[in-house]
């Protein structure tokens, strides 16, 4: 995390912000902006990247934890797509179809691969922007796949398992995490508009999360 990122983290308080830790791989800033645009946001404060990163990491951590349990029950050393589906069922999360650039995913938030809306605050680094654009040339998914894979592997190692994650399982993990993130941001946008504002803030995102999950 950059010095600016650490400074923002230090200034922010909230359940999601607490899931952003120095030393752990995080999604690029450019990805947080694309997720906001996918949710319909036309403008966002610069501090929104922290709770978005926190939510992505938290949701992925819980999914990987339960996928590891399903894998162990099946007596395997590789996380398969079926393990991720089982994890999603245990978490009462919808399992979406894997989207492609041409088809999108019927029944999920990824109904269109076209990115609409004006840019959010901040541009991210040039490397991050290029990384995200490269990812979106072949899929509707927003977070760079190798970055997401690294995050998933770090979490599995943290849980004491150095396992292989099948490509289909990784895709399923990413679809579920990104879909849940976009839905959270859509709810945050409702809070923004109800306050007669147009600029989404980190507080809106944290509030949307608390309304959905209750006091933690």
Swiss-Prot record:
Induction: Expression of viral histones begins 2-4 hpi and continues along the infectious cycle. Residues 1-23 are annotated as: Disordered. It is found in: Host nucleus; Host cytoplasm; Virion. It comes from the Viruses. Keywords: DNA condensation, Host cytoplasm, Host nucleus, Virion. The keyword Protease does not apply. Histone-like protein that is recruited to viral factories during viral replication and participates in viral DNA packaging and virion production probably by forming unstable nucleosome-like particles. May compact the viral DNA. Pfam families: Histone. This is Histone doublet H4-H3. Disulfide bonds: none annotated. Residues 1-12 have a biased composition (Basic residues). It comes from Melbournevirus. GO terms for cellular component: host cell cytoplasm; host cell nucleus; virion component. The N-terminus is similar to eukaryotic H4, whereas the C-terminus is similar to eukaryotic H3. One of its GO terms (molecular function) is protein heterodimerization activity. GO terms for biological process: chromosome condensation.
């Amino acid at each position: 995390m950059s010095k600016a990122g650490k400074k923002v983290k230090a200034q922010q308080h909230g359940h999601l912000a607490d899931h952003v830790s120095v030393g752990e791989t995080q999604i690029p800033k450019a990805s947080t902006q694309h997720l906001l645009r996918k949710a319909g946001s036309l403008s966002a404060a610069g501090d929104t990247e922290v709770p978005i990163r926190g939510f992505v990491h938290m949701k992925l951590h819980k999914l990987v934890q339960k996928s590891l349990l399903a894998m162990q029950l099946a007596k395997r050393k590789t996380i398969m797509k079926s393990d991720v589906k089982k994890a999603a069922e245990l978490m009462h999360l919808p399992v979406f179809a894997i989207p492609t650039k041409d088809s999108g995913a019927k029944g999920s938030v990824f109904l269109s691969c076209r990115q609409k809306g004006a840019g959010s605050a901040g541009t991210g680094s040039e490397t991050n922007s290029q990384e995200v654009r490269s990812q979106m040339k072949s899929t509707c998914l927003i977070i760079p796949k190798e970055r997401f894979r690294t995050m998933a592997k770090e979490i599995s190692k943290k849980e004491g398992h150095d396992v292989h994650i099948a490509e289909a399982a990784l895709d399923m993990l990413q679809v579920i995490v990104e879909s849940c993130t976009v839905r959270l941001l859509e709810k945050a946008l409702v809070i923004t508009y109800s306050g007669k504002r147009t600029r989404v803030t980190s507080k809106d995102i944290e509030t949307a999360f608390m309304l959905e999950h209750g006091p933690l």
